[in-house]
Amino acid sequence: YNPNPEDLKMLKNLSEEVIRNNADIGFAFDGDGDRCGYVDNNGNEIFSDIMGLLLARNFSEKYKSSKFVIDVKSTGLFGSDKILKSNDASVHYWKTGHSYIKQKTSEISALAGFERSGHYFFNKPIGRGYDDACLSAVEVCKLLDENPGSSISDLIENLPHTFNSPTMSPECPDNVKYEVIEKVIDMIEDRYKNKIKIADLEISSILTINGIRFTLEEEYD
């Protein structure tokens, strides 16, 4: 398989090794060492945005009023998390792509930037602003060390339950993909404006900085 933290074959192999060795956590590094994926102590994949949320919570306790940048594919839990809010942390959704997240993290002097593909950017005093998978793993190990009574699966279990899917990339020819995106944006914006429901739920907010992201009422995201 390709050394890709989002590759399910790679993560399955890592999961088997975590179980076989009774490990506390498994780390999946990509080929050039700037992305990291995760498997918990039970052998379950941890999506990178969820791990980013755990780290952001931990950082916000130490560095009050911190800023965090996340890509638009990330969980909506960032925007509703009570710990982040209690520590006066601010969350900024931005375009998908490691270069975009890196630039925005630097531009607004955010403490950290998390991209769902596994690129994490840490500014001082944690890091130096670039994506370093080894540093990501170190910070996760610190998180576990600072919570000696909890496994990584325990920490995740304490989060509100959400439903996630792997990154999906349907085939779309280059010469029509932007047209398709615009049509989808127009359709969702029309439903939002006219309060047309999706699965019996109204759209409560939309975000169009990179394609379109919409949130349904009752915080389904």
Label the model's feature ranges.
Residues M10, S48-L55, D132-S136, V140:
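Catalytic-loop motifs flanking and including active-site residues across diverse enzymes
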Residues I25-G26, G31-G43, T105-F114, I212:
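Self-splicing inteins and homing endonuclease
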Residues E45-K62, K95-T96:
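Short, acidic/small-residue loops that bind anionic groups at enzyme active sites
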Residues D34-L53, G79-D81:
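Short Gly/Thr/Asp-enriched flexible loops that form oxyanion-binding sites at enzyme active sites
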Residues Y1-Y38:
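N-terminal small/polar loop signature for handling phosphorylated ligands or for N-terminal nucleophile
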Residues P5, F29-G31, E45-I50, I126-A133:
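Short glycine/threonine-rich catalytic loop with a Thr-x-Gly-x-Asp
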Residues Y63-D221:
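Phosphate-binding and adjacent anionic-ligand microenvironments
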Residues L11-S15, F27, D32, A56, ...:
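Buried hydrophobic positions in well-ordered alpha/beta secondary-structure cores of metabolic enzymes
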